[in-house]
Regions:
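Flexible, surface-exposed loop/linker segments and immediately adjacent secondary-structure boundaries
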Residues: 23-157, 232-233, 266
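Long, contiguous interaction/recruitment modules in multidomain scaffold/adaptor proteins
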Residues: 121, 126-246
Length: 319
């Protein structure tokens, strides 16, 4: 069952949490980067509106919005500007989003954070109800990452999804011919070997996945040159400094991935999210962001599953 044919829980959350007509002119002042529902709920309302509505993961909060947590629920909110993060729990509710100081809006770190927040807030997320067919063992093998676009050469790992006990072959092809070929692969990932020919920045490579003699998936990617990679690393360091030392690890990962994705580095953004999930597997925002990345790279079924997981974790009581 595709994303267009299922109930879109997160879309409903985002729409019902919207402020009245005219609120679109308000600046984004914060974003929910973590949700811990516990036995309670995280709710939001716009300025001048009486009703509280459910707040979902990665919800962009406009200046003037109020956020509250009930019972033992809590949310982490990253603030625009160099203001770090705030944990909103019942004792700190309601929390009203304020505008960042005017003098921060010309700082590079502010603009970088705005780019990340803009990407994270621009994705219309559709979350299906649990569907057993999406987890069928009969699904075809598919390359998960990279899937087009630029990649950083120092973190290049090929990942795919296939049958549990099957063996696969990977081939990297340049315009001049085959650069790398590995067969008999089990598992689901292969780091680019250190003894393989170095990939040339700016060259369009084709990654092919084979099952037996059949090519089952194929994508293109490009390694960025060192100056561009160094610029990106410098920007990520500035974002880290702008967030401050007290931002929780998962929220930091969300913002780093948002900045990477806003610059087109979807492979590296996914790498950051997957790494964060190894230590915080129950965080709805990480699953929602993973769904965003899958949706943007042409993997609707994988996006469905990630959104489904985000929905279940953000609101365990919902059927």
């Amino acid at each position: 069952m595709g994303m267009r044919r299922v109930t879109a829980w997160l879309v409903v959350v985002m729409l019902t949490a919207a402020a009245p007509v005219g609120a679109q002119t308000r600046d984004i002042g914060a974003m929910i980067t973590e949700i811990k529902p516990g036995r309670g709920r995280i709710e939001v309302r716009g300025p001048g509106t009486p009703d509280w509505r459910p707040a979902g993961p990665l919800l962009a909060l406009k200046v003037g919005d109020s956020l509250r947590a009930t019972d033992d629920a809590a949310a982490v909110v990253v603030l625009a500007g160099r203001r770090g993060s705030v944990q909103v729990d019942a004792a700190r509710s309601p929390f009203v989003v304020t505008a960042p100081p005017a003098d921060t809006k010309l700082q590079k770190a502010f603009l970088l954070l705005e780019g990340g927040l803009g990407f994270l807030g621009s994705n219309p997320r559709e979350t299906p109800r649990p569907v057993l067919s999406t987890r069928s063992m009969a699904r075809p093998p598919v390359i998960l990452s990279p899937r087009g676009g630029p990649v950083m050469s120092d973190a290049l790992t090929f990942e795919w999804q296939g049958y549990q006990f099957a063996r696969y072959a990977l081939r990297v092809v340049a315009p001049s011919g085959i650069v790398l070929e590995r067969s008999g692969l089990t598992g689901s990932r292969l780091a680019y070997p250190a003894d393989a020919p170095p990939l040339v920045p700016g060259t369009a490579y084709t990654l092919q996945l084979f099952s037996g003699q059949s090519r089952v998936d194929e994508i293109r990617f490009e390694v960025v040159d060192r100056p561009r990679a160094d610029d990106l690393r410098r920007d990520l360091r500035e974002v880290d400094q702008a967030l401050g030392p007290d931002v929780p690890a998962s929220s930091r990962a969300v913002m780093q991935a948002g900045v990477l994705a806003s610059r087109g580095f979807l492979h590296d953004a996914r790498r950051v999210v997957v790494a964060a999930l190894t230590t915080d597997a129950d965080q709805p925002s990480l699953h929602a962001l993973l769904g965003d990345l899958y949706a943007r790279t042409g993997l609707p079924r994988e996006a469905d599953e990630a959104y489904e997981q985000a929905r279940a974790l953000a609101d365990p009581a919902r059927p």
